[in-house]
Amino acid sequence: MSTKEKLISHVSKEEAVGSRNKVTVVGVGMVGMASAISILLKDLCDELALVDVMEDKLKGEVMDLQHGSLFLKTHKIVGDKDYSVTANSRVVVVTAGARQQEGESRLNLVQRNVNIFKFIIPNIVKYSPNCILMVVSNPVDILTYVAWKLSGFPRHRVIGSGTNLDSARFRHIMGEKLHLHPSSCHGWIVGEHGDSSVPVWSGVNVAGVSLQTLNPKMGAEGDSENWKAVHKMVVDGAYEVIKLKGYTSWAIGMSVADLVESIVKNLHKVHPVSTLVKGMHGVKDEVFLSVPCVLGNSGLTDVIHMTLKADEEKQLVKSAETLWGVQKELTL
């Protein structure tokens, strides 16, 4: 008899039950691993699969996470370059792609990443035809459109991480300015994730008190408190972090886990995520931009109708036109 047989007496045959909450992260770079650890520490899945083309890095990351199994409640952590390892995932998070270089705009990255997606997306669909696809790779709005087109999935099952992080940065800086916790500072950044994002100043509030009623010039020129700088800090934030440490990882990883949580726990929380906005706010083209959306079990269930001022809507339409200008040149 083996040590195991001497130690344990078998009572019943374990029935093979598939994972109920399997999450896959594609890409084990800085963002992928920050997303993975954030998902694990929030106990959001019973199985985590990692995929990447760089086999040694992948193997090392999987082993490193497995060595911490004692401290986690996720009993299965797997990884392979073969997409069969991702089979039957509930949520697939795509972080893979060429990394944004210092000073490079997110839009510059496009065609490089489209070519990578042509390999990734069909493989995800093959093994998890019912999954919810979450795109994080930049430029996220265009790549969410690309993933939607390549997957053939209905629009509610393809979500971009969008301005969920931009809005978090906004609320953090607002909190610093007011000496309040970010969760008590309400403000939404919509539109493109990145340089032409739109801060909805009309909706900024604390405890239901609209800050624009207290300071009518908030967000505009001639505001003595220069709140406009808060949005500039949001836009420059990522570039600043990249300049200092070479990449961004922790905040986007936490943002991804926040979105995954709303889906797997069916929370019906509202998040600013990238979705198909054609027909909304004067947008005429087939583009993905961030607007407040309800996330639950089946993905994106509803869109909240924001009351935007004319100039905010104009900025949104301008963003859409910029994105469409790039999209129509892409070879899919």
From Swiss-Prot:
A Pfam entry, by short name: Ldh_1_C
Localization per Swiss-Prot or TrEMBL: Cytoplasm
GO biological process, one term: lactate metabolic process
Known catalytic reactions: (S)-lactate + NAD(+) = pyruvate + NADH + H(+)
EC number(s) stated in the UniProt entry for this protein: 1.1.1.27
Stored SUPFAM superfamilies: LDH C-terminal domain-like, NAD(P)-binding Rossmann-fold domains
Residues at which substrate binds: R106, N138, R169, T248
Positions of the catalytic residues: H193 (proton acceptor)
Keyword annotations of the record: Cytoplasm, NAD, Oxidoreductase
Protein role: Interconverts simultaneously and stereospecifically pyruvate and lactate with concomitant interconversion of NADH and NAD(+).
Family: Belongs to the LDH/MDH superfamily. LDH family.
Name used for this protein in its record: L-lactate dehydrogenase A chain
Species this chain originates from: Rhinogobiops nicholsii (Blackeye goby)
